[in-house]
Amino acid sequence: MPKFVVMLRVKDGMFFVAEWLQCFEKLADEIVVLDNGSTDGTYESLKAHPKVVDIVRTEGYNEGRDKNLLYEHTRRRNPDWILWVDIDEVFEPNLTRKHFDRLMKRSFVNKYAFRRFHFIDRENFAGSWFRLNYSAGHDRIMWREASSGYFENFILDSPNVKGIKGLKVNTNFRLKHMGYISKDIVDRKKDLYLGLIADEKKESLNEMYLSNEKPIKWVDDRNHPRVILLNGLLNCIQARHIADKVVSRTKSFLINRFRKPTTQNATAINS
């Protein structure tokens, strides 16, 4: 069977550690961790788990540096497939290793993508139209390891792995993002990010508090009619976004293709 390794970058995630390990110990063959200076027992708890086969520590906030270092250590485990997630993200509980084995055995697919749902408490996720539009996208990736893979070297918000070629398939596997359920945790994130982002973007940090959100009750059963209907709605939203992008790019291409040359360009052509 393919070797599946989960990579985790974390700082002071003790609030989520037990739940996270309960999820990924049943899915991953191995877990590789980068701890960015935890002081709350996170490092010790993760290091003690038998599935955690490597753990490295850094100081100072730099996501790009850390993810590339973590990727380097993960590659030493000779994985066939890799998944990067945060400590506050867990899959829906009904998913098993067999679900992932079925994905990994498809030789023509190199990437699988998963949706995240942003929880406002332990039982409800954010259901405003803005948040549903966000969840409609598949923003977590599991990939077949390749030497071309890398993470962009951004201090903040270094996104998913880059450089992995081949077919990507969106799945209906759901990730529960629990990072907003504790105000204390959101406060600490906001204080950290305030020192790292431009002034004009600082107001957007208030969105992390998920205030005035419409709560939607989470249902664990993947085959429940409400879950099937929700996935259908999100698929429609995503299809609309894709159609909008196609129209926009086609329009831009046609405008550039048939735009009349400027006077300067026309003079250059005539000369």
Regions found by a protein language model. Name each.
Residues P79-E92:
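Short beta-strand-to-loop acidic/aromatic patch adjacent to the donor-nucleotide binding site
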Residues D35-S45, G60-N62:
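A conserved acidic beta->alpha catalytic loop
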Residues K47-V53:
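Short, conserved SAM-binding/catalytic segment
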Residues N68-W81:
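Active-site nucleotide-sugar/metal-binding loop of Leloir-type enzymes
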Residues K3-V5:
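Cell-envelope/extracellular polymer assembly enzymes that use nucleotide-activated donors
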Residues R65-Y71, P93-S271:
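Catalytic-site signature of metal-activated, phosphate-bearing donor transferases
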Residues M7-L27:
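Short, well-formed alpha-helical segments that are part of the catalytic scaffolds
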Residues F15, E59-K67:
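A short, glycine-/small-residue-rich helix N-cap motif at loop->alpha-helix starts
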